[in-house]
Regions:
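Beta-strand-rich modules
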Residues: 42-61
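Extracellular low-complexity, O-glycosylation-prone stalks/linkers
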Residues: 12-29
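Aromatic-Pro/Gly-enriched surface loop or interdomain linker
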Residues: 11, 56-145, 198-202
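A glycine-rich, often tryptophan-bearing local segment used as a flexible ligand/cofactor-contacting loop or short
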Residues: 146-221
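Short S/T/G- and acidic-enriched coil/turn segments that sit immediately N-terminal to beta-strands
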Residues: 35-41, 68
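Solvent-exposed serine/threonine-rich low-complexity stretches and specific carbohydrate-binding patches
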Residues: 28-36
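Conserved hydrophobic/aromatic "anchor" residues
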Residues: 6, 16, 27, 51-53, ...
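Conserved aromatic anchor
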Residues: 1-13
Length: 221
């Protein structure tokens, strides 16, 4: 089976509602849980089954907007692939998200992973140590348009990622502002530049490539 876990938010609540989906788009009826519950287990799922979940809070007769959509595929433990959602800017900045809705970007990433089991986690759980990177052979780290204010990789994350890669891990990073945050002409610290250049092994050229098309190198993905 699969287990979904969420943090104990500091607000008045009478319960939670979990919604499950096979594709991250169409969700079934709510599964009602008590306000003291912070995990939900979807049991007896065969190997290879994919599920996507979102959670809402119930209190004072109203239901909150749903959480981000996270998914997983049943397989061996620990999962070969860990999807890390580091895209907070979209959720909290009005200019990025005028409707105030939560996102399903991590779910789309899960759907693109063909074959191996995967789990999805918020980057805060990686920072806290609740979900370590080390057991997973591959990590997909999503940053969207995270930049200087929200930070693409903060000091704690840089250390965790560097240690993971030095131990032989494999990392795929997706983000539009990583180079600007960590290696633009002025602003980044020496530690940020070092991480970008020697750990991520990237080279910052300009703030805008002026294209949405690219061709991978022969030895690339």
């Amino acid at each position: 089976g699969l287990t979904l876990a969420w943090s104990n938010e500091d607000f008045v609540r009478t319960g939670y509602r979990v919604y499950a989906s096979d594709d991250g788009v169409t969700f079934g009826p709510p599964i009602n849980l008590g306000g003291h519950m912070h995990t939900f287990t979807d049991p007896n799922l065969p190997v290879g089954t994919e599920r996507y979940y979102r959670v809402s809070v119930v209190g004072s007769g109203v239901e909150s907007k749903p959480s981000r959509i996270y998914g997983a595929r049943v397989g061996r433990t620990p999962s070969p692939v860990l999807v890390v959602d580091g895209n907070d800017r979209w959720s909290f900045q009005t200019s990025e998200n005028p409707a105030g809705a939560n996102h399903g970007f991590a779910a789309l990433t899960g759907r693109s992973i063909s074959g191996p089991a995967f789990d999805t986690v918020h980057h805060g759980a990686v920072i806290s140590g609740a979900v370590p990177l080390s057991p997973h052979p591959a990590v997909v780290w999503l940053l969207g348009e995270e930049s200087t204010a929200d930070e693409t990789f903060d000091a704690a994350e840089r250390t965790l990622v560097a240690n993971y890669l030095n131990a032989g891990g494999n990392l795929f990073v997706s983000g539009a502002e990583i180079g600007w945050h960590l290696d633009r002409a002025s602003g980044p610290t020496a530690a940020e530049r070092n991480f970008y250049r020697t750990v991520l092994r990237a080279a910052y050229v300009a703030d805008d490539a002026n294209t949405y098309a690219f061709v991978p190198t022969g030895a690339g993905i």
